Regions:
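Glycine-rich, aromatic-lined ligand/substrate-binding cores of catalytic
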Residues: 498-687, 691-692
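Structural recognition of the beta-strand scaffold that forms the well-ordered cores
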Residues: 75, 208-211, 326-330, 432-435, ...
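Short, aromatic- and glycine-rich surface loops/edge beta-strands on solvent-exposed regions
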Residues: 294-300
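Aromatic-Pro/Gly-enriched surface loop or interdomain linker
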Residues: 240-275, 302-446, 696-697, 702-710
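Helical hinge/lid and interdomain linker segments adjacent to catalytic or ligand-binding clefts
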Residues: 272-273, 284-286, 290-292, 409-496, ...
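Signal that preferentially marks extracellular ectodomain short beta-strand elements
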Residues: 22, 164-168, 271, 275-291
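Solvent-exposed loop/turn segments at secondary-structure junctions
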Residues: 57, 160-161, 217, 332-336, ...
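Extracellular glycan-associated modules
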Residues: 1-243
């Protein structure tokens, strides 16, 4: 049917908002304000509001701001016009400053202080750089500030208004803020110096003091910033300002907030962050109780219903009571990591890494030009910082079933996983679906009812809970078919209060789009160290038998059966397949082996009794060894030279009749539909699913003792 829709607006940018029902921060007399700041955006991009209670549309209130020339200002306005005290020296990017301003109501005198607080670790430049950071300016203002009672104090922006969208936050700040505060009198230079050096503001005069280092626990910190002053004016994060970030006094000795929370007062803001569009509900759909578990989409059409006029809202129906023997585990965490990525446009490596010219569509351009769509964890914020949060509360075009990755011209993530869904449907298997969020929330209990769990083509992002559950499932007798490449790679977690939001910290190793800054390697949401599971003692080889070795994107190759495949414990896997070649076809560049690939590696934890069923080979030099495998770089680490660059199909058994089969290749699943599903890749997978989904012992179990002598 037809739905009536309306234009809705999205608040972009992260900031803190301070509920102040008694208007404690509508100050009639003298006052002072202060903060430590670390600006990160080039000043010439436009004005930024650091903190204050200011309405830019109505010219009323007070605030710290940065003008278009990069100069700090203390601004007051009376409802008609504004006046300001400006620093003499522009702020520099990635430098820590203490800023303070006082206003004496009896004289109208305002004083602005700007002082660099650079140590050997905390800023872009060190002590040897002879830069003058300090400025102290005092002027008599033309009028005293007035206040609008219907606005709140903000950190990271200022209030604005538009006739169509109403009130919103504008002049968004990019950078860190640490321990801002407001006191009820004009402080002296000596008192500001005391706070600048790490002292507390005068206790009896505090109106609000947001101690950004308060609230850390072993499991992270939330979005609420504690006001330790007498009025409890706690600040609420909007669009997830990033916490667990180093503050002005970080001295380089501690790399985690658990060790020195007082050095982690930095809260980082980005003017293009988006976590929740905050839209009103347009339409509600009630899912029938008898709807089968599976993958569904609502198709929306506007106008002619083509191109940008067509959209799909994808959703997954989980069984209320699991009954099927097979579960398809939808890798929604990885979908979230790649959601609306801008790599084609912004990444200099995009074209050489895929070995071809990207081809963009109208929707790619639309997403790139519209900040309301948000960013992926492969992108950078406008100030150059890596994006560590991704959320489902926004439109995600890469979840469109018809979407093609513009970089490599093939399906990717969800659209690629539809090949597995199509195969299950074509073969009439009795299966149900669940998502990464289900696995993360409920652990092993979510998959224990199933005999066989099948993953998607690229389950790259995995939380500790998910990894624990997967291992416990196999140890308990479950059978796992890992259908992808480069899986179980990055450690992630979901925000407890915002389960639609995921965090990742990309560190000093791994194929990555950005590096977390020094000292900022631990996640706000859990307190866990981010980065590769390999570097946390849990390489994917330990759970899957294979781990990431190479990526190429421009071509794929077939698999060739290995000697292990003829052993009587595993020969059933290739039963009915003629010859040695498997998968010399596929929707992903004509082969089942490629895109991103994993290999068998005993030194990284592949179980010693694991069998290599088949391996790809003959990859091009566009396939390079992943960087975490490289200690010294030298020629020859590419597909035509390095024997390690291959995809390995690996099988091994576990306790209680459990087992794992890994394809080692993203392209494997996209070979299934070829020749109307009548092909040797499909046959191999059918052999596995048939065996894995039945009660009793696995085929070849009668000779399982042979494994002790086989290698």
């Amino acid at each position: 049917g037809a739905w009536q829709v309306k234009k809705q607006y999205t608040q972009v940018g992260s900031y803190l908002q301070v509920p102040d029902p008694e208007n404690r921060l509508c100050i009639d007399g003298s006052f002072s304000m202060f903060a430590y700041i670390w600006p990160s955006l080039h000043p010439k991009v436009g004005a930024q509001a650091v903190c204050g209670r200011y309405d830019d549309f109505n010219n009323i209130g007070y605030a710290f701001g940065i003008d278009e020339t990069g100069h700090l200002g203390f601004i007051v306005a009376d409802g008609k016009e504004f006046d300001a005290v400006l620093s003499e020296i522009p702020l520099q990017r990635h430098i820590w400053y203490f800023i303070g301003a006082s206003y004496d109501a009896s004289t109208g005198r305002a004083t602005l202080h700007q002082m660099g607080v650079v140590n050997r670790y905390n800023s872009l430049w060190g002590k040897v750089t002879p830069m003058d950071y300090d400025s102290h300016v005092s002027e008599t203002l033309r009028f005293k500030p007035k206040h609008a009672p219907d606005i709140s104090f903000l950190v990271g922006g200022t209030w604005d208004f538009h006739a169509n969208r109403g009130k919103f936050v504008n002049e968004l700040y990019s950078g860190k803020v640490d321990r801002p505060g407001v006191v009820s009198r004009a402080l002296s230079r000596e008192e500001f110096d005391h706070i600048c050096s790490g002292g507390k503001p005068p206790k009896n005069d505090i109106l609000a003091y947001w101690d950004t280092s308060v609230g850390y626990t072993d499991t992270g910190i939330g979005d609420t910033v504690t006001d330790t002053g007498p009025h409890g004016l706690h600040a609420i994060g909007v669009n997830k300002p990033v916490r667990a970030q180093t503050g002005w006094n970080w001295n380089g000795r501690n790399d985690c907030f658990r060790l020195a929370p007082e050095e982690y007062g930095g809260i980082e803001f980005h003017d293009d962050a988006i976590i929740d569009c905050g839209w009103d509900v347009t339409h509600r759909l009630t899912i029938p109780d008898n709807l089968k578990s599976g993958v569904y989409a609502i198709r929306l059409r506007a106008g002619e219903g083509t191109g940008l006029g067509e959209e799909y809202i994808v959703f997954f129906i989980r069984a209320k009571t699991p009954r099927a023997p097979i579960a398809l585990l939808i890798p929604t965490a990885s979908y979230l990591a790649y959601a609306n990525d801008h790599l084609t446009f912004d990444a200099q490596m995009a074209q050489p890494i895929v070995g071809q010219t990207p081809i963009v569509s109208d929707i790619d351009i639309e997403v790139y030009q519209s900040p309301e769509f948000g960013l992926s964890t492969y992108d950078h914020h406008r100030d150059g910082a890596g994006v560590c949060y991704s959320s489902y509360r926004r439109p995600i075009v890469s979840l469109h079933p018809k979407y093609r990755n513009p970089m490599n011209g093939v399906t990717w993530q969800f659209p690629a996983d539809l090949s597995i869904v199509a195969w299950l449907e074509h073969c009439n298997y009795d299966y149900e679906v669940l998502t990464d969020e289900d696995l993360h929330r409920e652990g092993v209990d979510s998959i224990t009812p199933y005999k066989c769990v099948i993953t998607g083509t690229h389950p790259e992002y995995y939380s500790e809970t998910m990894l624990d559950a997967t291992e416990d499932f196999v140890v308990g007798g479950g059978r796992l078919i890992y259908m992808g490449g480069n899986g179980y790679y990055w450690n992630v977690d979901f925000c407890e209060d915002e389960p639609w939001c995921m965090e990742v910290r990309k560190l000093d190793s791994g194929m990555r789009a950005w590096n977390a800054k020094p000292g900022e390697h631990y996640m706000q949401t859990t307190g866990q160290k981010g980065g590769l599971w390999k570097n946390l003692g849990r390489p994917p080889q330990k759970a899957l038998g294979v781990g990431f070795i190479s990526q190429g994107f421009e071509s794929c190759r077939p698999f060739r059966r290995m000697p292990d495949s003829w052993h009587r414990t595993v020969s059933w896997i290739t039963e009915g397949i003629e010859g040695e070649i498997i998968g010399d076809f596929g929707l992903a560049h004509g082969g089942a082996g490629g895109i991103e690939m994993d290999r068998y590696d005993l030194e990284k934890g592949t179980p010693p009794h694991a069998r290599i069923i088949a391996s790809s080979g003959g990859h091009t030099d566009n396939y390079m060894l992943v960087c975490e495998e490289v200690l010294y770089a030298f020629p020859g680490m590419t597909g035509t030279y390095d024997h390690r660059i291959r995809a390995d199909m690996v099988y091994f058994t576990s306790s209680n009749n459990g087992a794992v089969f890994s394809t080692g290749s993203i392209a494997f699943g996209q070979a299934l539909p070829c020749h109307n599903f009548d092909n040797n890749v499909s046959k191999l997978l059918a052999n596995l699913v048939d065996a894995f989904s039945k009660d009793g012992s696995l085929p070849g179990g009668a000779w399982i003792s042979d494994e002790k002598q086989w290698r």
